[in-house]
C-alpha cells in the first residue's frame, strides 16, 4: 500500500507490481503501484499539513527523530532482512547500512534543537542582521535502490528536523525497506 496523509491505502488505479528477490527471482511481495493521481494526492496531503507541522517545536521534532533512531536499532534485523531479500545485499552489509542509516536520525535529532538562527553584523558595522531558519515547505525525496534505508534516513531526517512535510518516492526495486521505514516513522 501507499502511505498518504498518514494513512495506508491502495493505489487509486488498483494496479500492483511484484518485488522480486534478485538472487532467486521469487516474488517476495506485491505492492500498490502509484500513478500521477496518487502523486498529486500525496503532495496535496503534504501541503495540507505543512503549516501545522511547521508549528511543532524543534524539541518535538527532535524527540520524534530520536525515537525513530531507537526503533530502527530495535528493528535492525528486520530492516537488514528486508534489504537482503529485496536487493541481494549480503546480510552483514545490510546490517551495516542499518547502523549507518540510523545515525542520520540521531544526528538530526540533535540538530533539530539548534534552530535558533544567528546575528551577523552588516558590512557597514552599524547594524546587525538576523538570520532565521524556517521550513521551506513540502519536500520531494527520491531514493536510489542501492542504499534504501540510509538514503531515506539521510533525506527524511533533515526534513523532519526543519519542520518540512515530505513525499518519499523509493526506488521501485527496493520499496519494502522504505515502507518499513515509513511505518517506523509513524510509530515514532
Tell where the protein language model's regions lie, with residue ranges.
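Terminal low-complexity tails and localization/encapsulation signals of metabolic enzymes
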Residues: 1-30, 63, 67, 99, ...
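Alpha-helix N-cap/helix-start motif
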Residues: 12, 39, 76, 94, ...
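Glycine-rich loop-to-alpha-helix module at the N-terminal edge of alpha/beta enzyme cores
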Residues: 26-116, 126
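Rossmann-like NAD(P) dinucleotide-binding subdomain of oxidoreductase/dehydrogenase enzymes
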Residues: 117-188
